[in-house]
Swiss-Prot record:
Entry EC no(s): 6.1.1.4
The organism of origin for this protein: Brucella ovis (strain ATCC 25840 / 63/290 / NCTC 10512)
Motif ('HIGH' region): 43-53
GO molecular function, one term: ATP binding
Motif position, 'KMSKS' region: 628-632
Entry similarity comment: Belongs to the class-I aminoacyl-tRNA synthetase family.
Name of the protein in its database record: Leucine--tRNA ligase
Keywords associated with the record: Aminoacyl-tRNA synthetase, ATP-binding, Cytoplasm, Ligase, Nucleotide-binding, Protein biosynthesis
GO-annotated cellular components: cytosol
Catalytic activity: tRNA(Leu) + L-leucine + ATP = L-leucyl-tRNA(Leu) + AMP + diphosphate
Cited Pfam families: Anticodon_1, tRNA-synt_1, tRNA-synt_1_2, tRNA-synt_1g
A GO BP annotation: leucyl-tRNA aminoacylation
Protein origin, superkingdom: Bacteria
InterPro entries: aa-tRNA-synth_I_CS (IPR001412), aa-tRNA-synth_Ia (IPR002300), Leu-tRNA-ligase (IPR002302), Leu_tRNA-synth_edit (IPR025709), M/V/L/I-tRNA-synth_anticd-bd (IPR013155), Methionyl/Leucyl_tRNA_Synth (IPR015413), Rossmann-like_a/b/a_fold (IPR014729), tRNAsynth_Ia_anticodon-bd (IPR009080)
Length: 877
């Protein structure tokens, strides 16, 4: 009898209600089972989830459901990274308060996430804009302040002229603001900083322990931390060229071996010497102002055109008083890095070469590539940056660069310049302290008070939280807190006099730097429950995009260390395993030069070609490239539409099945339809066979087709489990396709009443295994199938969500036969299929019976038959 078509809309709503009523996914901290903490990066509540969210959270849910089935006490929470600029932009554009806009979006997105059937513990939900959350963040801030990990200082900052706020160096991408895309400028402001540089060495060394992180992410962090071992060299200013009070320029270099190739010294626009020289020099003052228009990050420097201003000052070469080098103020040198001064060796640094060519400075190669002739070697448009031997370097000639480094260091360390060594070895880090002050309203208020008499002091703990005022106006750019009539005015906690609140709010990356810790006990009055935090942390599996490799992930690594210093956690690293998933991408479409949505077009195959037209008018549509889904290009697919049309399980199955999870997945309507057909196929096979299997005890087959069914199922259990452990979801999906194909004929026999008792037992077990294996990917379908089978696993009534992962029998997983390649005189001629435990004599006899061996021997006997056990056979004719 044909089964009714599976109705995902009805089934999914039903099982989601059952899970919720049974509190199936709520986690008890006191559970004694081994813990497993799986977490996907929590979303910003922008309005609606997109297919990237579906893929990210589906992956995490597979891991959570699988680990739960394997007997772990799983923590799988969800929250909202809810502070940030878009809410303020919406307030300005739509005249809606950021709080209202944010919580409306949270409600919408929570409904969407729930419709996906994710096994989330919603009892631990919070938004970072909840007063209860940012209250604890303010407590943390004060704790870190008291431990000396927060400081306030004046510094050059990256200023986003569109968003009217400061950006951390990590938030400047190719010289532009990470959100607005505006070219970033330099400004000097007094800011609050987290002293992440206190942990530079620790953060670098810790990367070696993160063997479950992608090497690409670890490399990105290593480069960002940027440890370098170099030499700090003092260059004496040439007599008669230096202004009063200046006698030297101190330079940090990682390549002292190239000193004899030096062509210039460059100093920062903020170097004390540059400032002194700019007094009364309008041209230099103008150049310095131009330098200040670019960002302070290394990325900004790397993308800007390299410019310099010749100061007329000269410095003496450290090894030759008669050799003088010009001093430039340059836009590619930052005061915050090293000493604010560098020497340029054009032959062996591309930036220096470009600069030297622009200002017609001498280019002298001092490192000779292997195999080149010193007499004829020269530098063209590309600097030579590899290894070699030293040339044109006097006493260094013939040395390797490494030996030359040490020789230069040794000599200059022993050379006296005005009572001090001319050089000292020094370790530098590229990493700078994390500036967290933001001139925005919609963020966590910094809990500090400014008093003219007492200075800057923390808000007393009893007065926390410092709440954001609701009565603010967004009628113009800038920070509404600065303009608030009453909020910023407060009494000094020390003297009781008039004082003012800090009106800057925290960088929103602070909110996401410790949220994983709060999930362990979100009901606690303190930021953490130390026992719960130490039990659950580190997160066993963290899943999110590689775009967070530096920003969020580095800040989180700092925060666990800072919280450890403050006594809130006992771990150093927040995330044991990290997986960075690929994006969901889609074709793009244009009609009359305008982007059009895939929902508005029809695609047909005409004469072997895909042809697209508009649904409403039939107008031709140009099919473009496959790109990341984006609203601007309209190549987005709304998860609500997919779930309404096909069901959540189809959406989940498709994003898990089509490509390796670390790669992009191309969303296609045909792919979604194919996934949906598979959902219907599983349902039909199980539902039609269910009457015959419902009251049958599961039992592995021992012979014939029943044994084949059991072998296929047990092998799949082992393989799919291994695949999920390795996060190879697409391979697990492929194995389930194979298993369904293998079982389909036997299930149809059972449905037709043609299966014997042994086959029914084998099918009952195999079908239970199939249902339990599909559950992490398609949980609603799995529950519906098990209900159809009587709601029992191994004879016990249960929800699939609470059922254990099936156990395979090792004897059924081992292949009894193997295929051995057969060579004749060293060349493969065919294969031999034989029992795995066959002895050497049996293998030799079987080989002689093969037709292609008989033909090769032509009635004769072989000289020798070489059998490599379990590997290969070679017949020597």
């Amino acid at each position: 009898m044909a089964a009714e078509r599976y109705n995902p809309r009805v089934a999914e709503a039903h099982w989601q209600k059952v899970w919720e009523e049974n509190r199936t996914f709520e986690t008890d901290n006191s559970d004694s089972r081994e813990k497993y903490y799986v977490l996907e990066m929590f979303p910003y509540p922008s309005g609606r989830i997109h297919m990237g969210h579906v893929r990210n959270y589906a992956m995490g849910d597979v891991v959570a459901r699988y680990k739960r089935a394997k007997g772990f006490n799983v923590l799988h929470p969800m929250g909202w990274d809810a502070f940030g600029m878009p809410a303020e932009n919406a307030a300005m554009q739509n005249k809606v308060h950021p709080k209202e806009w944010t919580y409306q979006n949270i409600a919408t997105m929570k409904r969407q996430l729930k419709s996906m059937g994710l096994s989330l513990d919603w009892s631990r939900e919070f938004a970072t804009c909840d007063v209860e959350y940012y209250h604890r963040q303010q407590m943390l801030f004060i704790d870190l302040y008291e431990k000396g990990l927060v400081t306030r200082k004046t510094s050059k900052v990256n200023w986003d002229p569109v968003d009217n706020t400061v950006l951390a160096n990590e938030q400047v991408v190719d010289g532009r603001g990470w959100r607005s895309g505006a070219l970033v400028e330099q400004r000097e402001l007094t800011q609050w900083f987290f002293k992440i540089t206190d942990f530079s060495e620790e953060l670098l060394a810790g990367l070696d322990t993160l063997d479950q992180w992608p090497e690409k992410v670890r490399l990105m962090q290593r480069n960002w931390i940027g440890k370098s071992e170099g030499l700090q060299v003092r260059f004496a200013l040439a007599a008669g060229t230096a202004p009063a009070g200046f006698s030297e320029v101190e330079v940090y270099t990682t390549r002292p071996d190239t000193l004899f190739g030096a062509a210039f010294v460059a100093i920062s626009a903020d170097h004390p010497l540059a400032k002194k020289l700019s007094e009364g020099n309008a041209a230099l003052s103008s150049f310095i102002e131009e330098c200040h228009q670019q960002g302070t990050s290394l990325a900004a420097l790397e993308t800007a055109e390299k410019k310099g201003f010749d100061t007329g000052i000269k410095v003496k070469h450290p090894f030759d008083d008669n050799w003088e080098l010009p001093v430039y103020v340059a836009n590619f040198v930052l005061m915050e890095y090293g000493t604010g001064a560098v020497f340029g060796c054009p032959a062996h640094d591309q930036r220096d070469l470009d600069f030297a060519n622009k200002y017609k400075l001498k280019v002298t190669p001092v490192v000779l590539p292997k195999g080149e002739d010193a007499a004829s070697f020269s530098i063209g448009e590309t600097a030579y940056t590899d290894d070699g031997v030293m040339i044109n370097s006097r006493f260094l000639d013939g040395m390797t660069p490494e030996a030359a480094f040490n020789e230069v260091a040794s000599r200059l360390e022993k050379t006296d310049l005005v009572g001090r060594p001319q050089a000292v070895r020094k370790v530098q880090f590229r990493l700078r302290d994390w500036g967290i002050s933001r001139q925005r309203y919609w963020g966590c208020p910094i809990p500090m008070i400014h008093c003219e008499s007492c200075g800057v002091n923390p808000v007393p703990r009893a007065d926390l939280p410092v709440k954001l005022p609701d009565d603010v106006e967004f009628d113009r750019p800038g920070n509404p807190l600065d303009r608030h009539a009453t909020w910023r005015h407060v009494k000094c906690p020390k003297c009781g006099g008039d004082a003012r609140r800090e009106t800057d709010t925290m960088d929103t990356f602070v909110d996401s730097s410790w949220y994983y810790t709060r999930f362990t006990a979100p009901w606690e009055n303190e930021p953490t429950d130390r026992k719960a935090a130490d039990h659950w942390l580190p997160v066993d599996q963290y899943i999110g995009g590689i775009e967070h490799a530096i920003l969020h992930l580095l800040y989180s690594r700092f925060f666990t260390r800072a919280m450890k210093v403050a006594g809130h956690v006992g771990v150093d690293e927040p995330f044991k395993g990290l997986f960075t998933q690929g994006m969901v991408v889609h074709e793009t479409y244009k009609a009359n030069g305008q982007w059009v949505s895939p929902a508005d077009i029809r695609i047909e195959e005409i004469d072997g070609k895909r042809v697209a037209t508009m649904l409403d008018s039939g107008a031709p549509v140009e099919i473009g490239s496959i790109e990341k889904m984006s609203k601007s290009k309209k190549n987005v697919v709304d998860p609500d539409d997919i779930i309404a049309s096909y069901g959540a399980d189809t959406a989940r199955w498709f994003v898990l099945s089509d490509s390796p999870p670390e790669r992009d997945v191309i969303w296609t309507e045909a792919g979604a339809e194919g996934a949906h057909r598979f959902v219907q196929r599983i349902w039909r096979l199980v539902a039609e066979a269910a009457p015959a299997l419902k009251d049958v005890a599961p039992k592995a087959g021992t012979q014939g087709e029943a044994l084949g069914v059991s072998k296929a199922a047990h092998k799949a259990v082992k393989a799919v489990g291994d695949d999920i452990e390795k996060l190879a979801f697409n391979r697990g999906v492929a194995r389930l396709y194979e298993l369904v194909n293998t079982l389909s004929g036997a299930l149809q026999q059972a449905a037709d009443g043609k299966a014997d008792a042994e086959m029914k037992g084998a099918l009952r077990e195999a079908t239970e295994m199939l249902v339990l294996m599909t559950a992490p990917m398609m949980p609603h379908l799995a529950e519906q199938c098990l209900a159809e089978l009587g709601g029992k696993v191994a004879g016990k009534e249960t929800l699939v969500a609470r059922a254990p992962w099936p156990v395979f029998d090792p004897a059924l997983v081992v292949e009894n036969e193997i295929v051995l390649p057969v060579q004749i005189n060293g060349k493969k001629r065919g294969d031999l299929t034989i029992a795995r435990d066959a002895d050497q004599a049996s293998i030799q006899q079987a080989v002689l019976e093969l037709d292609f061996v008989k033909a090769a021997l032509n009635g004769g006997s072989p000289k020798k038959i070489i059998v490599v056990p379990q590997r290969i056979v070679n017949v020597v004719a």
